[in-house]
């Protein structure tokens, strides 16, 4: 169950950068 974690981590990074 690492796919969800990775997705969340990447999503958080993108949001922080301001990239949709």
From Swiss-Prot:
Q: In which tissues is it expressed?
A: Secreted into the hemolymph.
The record's GO molecular-function terms, alphabetically, read:
lipid binding
The subcellular location is: Secreted, Extracellular space
Q: What positions does the domain Vitellogenin occupy?
A: 1-20
Entry keywords, A to Z: Hemolymph clotting, Lipid-binding, Secreted
Pull one GO CC term from this UniProt entry: extracellular region
An example Gene Ontology biological process:
hemolymph coagulation
Role according to the record: Involved in lipid transport. Plays a role in hemolymph clotting. May be involved in wound healing in the cuticle.
UniProt-recorded name of the protein: Fibrinogen
- The record lists the organism as Pacifastacus leniusculus
